[in-house]
A protein has these predicted regions:
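WD40-like beta-propeller blades
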Residues: 1-271
């Protein structure tokens, strides 16, 4: 069993001595943004980046920051697969889907009002009735309604698992795309219920999830107290406690790979 002090000591040795010296990074002027940025999101392969603010969005190429397209929106999300696939919440009752940067579908969510969007392998619409409604990117068909007040939605890279975080916990569900495809192809989608058998609850996380990231079937997250944890099936493990800074779990898996390789997940404390 590793104690907290030992975890902190191991992390200090992994990361090397902290000198707090400034890194000599060469800056390059790539231009100025035409709006006040309040949110920045890369697409799934990092080739494009969306800058959003003041109910507008601009999509740039990630390296040269060349303007690709722009528009007005209340919310913006990227697809979990398509390079140029994204969705915008145009109004409280209309969502537009774009395939390869061209408008493809218009979705009118089956809820009194949509209050937000979640990206990933399905389009998630945050309903005004404390729910999240999932829609297919290609067809725009209604997949399923999950009755939880979602704060954030985290999809695994494979798309077969999803974590829905709320204000006081989280729910990890499995997603069966094979059940959705034939129902969509044969037009057997219920406007009220979507497609039965697409989602199943695997387990709950009785903790606040402030940010998170999937690595395979393992969900790693930071809670509101700055504690880094991970879950595998119904088991929850503690990685380490961040003492000085409130950090976010980044999209890069390099840090997570270091933890797994150097410390070893199975050596950590089972909570």
């Amino acid at each position: 069993m590793l104690e907290d002090w030992y975890l902190r000591a191991r992390m200090a040795s992994l990361m090397g001595k902290t000198t707090q010296e400034r890194l000599p990074i060469i800056r390059r002027d790539l231009g100025a943004c035409e709006l006040y940025p309040q949110m920045l999101k890369h697409n799934y392969n990092g080739r494009f980046v969306a800058v959003c603010g003041d109910e507008e969005f601009i999509i740039y190429t990630a390296q040269a920051l060349r303007n690709k397209t722009f528009g007005q929106t209340l919310d913006f999300v990227w697809s979990g697969t398509g390079t140029g696939d994204y969705a915008i919440r145009e109004t409280i009752n209309r969502v537009k889907v774009f395939k390869n940067f061209k408008e493809s579908k218009t979705i009118k969510p089956a809820t009194s009002s949509s209050e937000g969007l979640f990206g990933g392998h399905l389009i998630g619409v945050k309903g005004g009735d404390s729910s999240v409604l999932f829609y297919d990117w290609d067809s725009g068909e209604f997949i399923r309604k999950i009755d939880v007040a979602a704060k954030e939605v985290y999809w695994s890279d494979s798309g077969n698992m999803v974590c829905i975080a709320t204000s006081d916990g989280a729910y990890v569900l499995s997603y069966n795309a094979q059940a959705a495809a034939p129902a969509i192809a044969m037009g057997q989608v219920s406007p009220e219920d979507g497609i039965d058998g697409t989602f199943d609850l695997l387990y709950e996380i009785n903790d606040n999830v402030s940010s998170g990231k999937w690595v395979g079937d393992c969900f790693i997250y930071m809670n509101n107290n700055g504690r880094l944890n991970y879950t595998v099936s119904v088991d929850k493990f503690k990685l380490l406690f961040i003492l000085r800074h409130q950090l976010l779990v980044l999209q890069s898996t390099q840090f997570l790979d270091i933890l797994q390789r150097k410390i070893g997940f199975m050596s950590l404390i089972n909570l």
